[in-house]
Amino acid sequence: MISAGDFRKGVTFVMDGHPYVVIDFQHVKPGKGAAFVRTKYKNLKTGSTREEAFNPSDKFPRAHIETKEMQYLYNDSDLYYFMDNETYEQVPLTLVEVEDAIKYLKENDSAIIKFYEGRPFQVEPPIFVELKVIETEPGVKGDTATNVTKAATVETGAIVYVPVFVNEGNIIKVDTRTGEYMSRV
């Protein structure tokens, strides 16, 4: 059990049968009245966030999250298949479970899959990925103003804003946390 007074960023807990992770917290002790913990937390299954004030003595069971590195194999209409690198077991995931991560994953790429009670609920791609630009407008010669960007579609279908000197066929490094262009490879 964990008390609300012990909440920190990244702490997982179970409330009403759903697993949550603390995104932000603030211990508040007003001049008048009892202290409380203002908490912003995210549902690990649905991804929805909420803010709520808890009494510091409120207790919750910890949510035990298991993580595994798995390899993305392929997608078959609505399902995305990942393989456990140790047991070679294949796990099918829905589009809701792979969310934004699939925009940055190519076949055979590794990803971190998070499980709660044996069920996968979230996919985390590597922090940096290298992707090939398949479609973008050609750069205009002489357009050297700083921070000029253009939209580029990469091989996974994601749209990344890149500097004007990046052309089709270039391989770029992308930060998957923000979706931003990092460099040309």
Swiss-Prot record:
Encoding gene, per UniProt annotation: efp
Pathway(s) where this gene product acts: Protein biosynthesis; polypeptide chain elongation
SUPFAM superfamilies associated with the record: Nucleic acid-binding proteins, Translation proteins SH3-like domain
Domain of life: Bacteria
PANTHER family cross-referenced by the UniProt entry: ELONGATION FACTOR P, ELONGATION FACTOR P (EF-P) FAMILY PROTEIN
Family: Belongs to the elongation factor P family.
One Gene Ontology term, aspect cellular component: cytoplasm
Role this protein plays: Involved in peptide bond synthesis. Stimulates efficient translation and peptide-bond synthesis on native or reconstituted 70S ribosomes in vitro. Probably functions indirectly by altering the affinity of the ribosome for aminoacyl-tRNA, thus increasing their reactivity as acceptors for peptidyl transferase.
GO biological process: peptide biosynthetic process
Annotated Pfam families: EFP (PF01132), EFP_N (PF08207), Elong-fact-P_C (PF09285)
Location of the protein in the cell: Cytoplasm
Source organism phylogeny: Bacteria, Bacillati, Bacillota, Clostridia, Peptostreptococcales
Cytoplasm in keyword set: yes
Record key words, sorted: Cytoplasm, Elongation factor, Protein biosynthesis
Species of origin: Alkaliphilus metalliredigens (strain QYMF)
One example GO MF annotation: translation elongation factor activity
Name of this protein: Elongation factor P
Keyword ATP-binding part of the UniProt annotation: no
NCBIfam families for this protein: efp, PRK00529.1
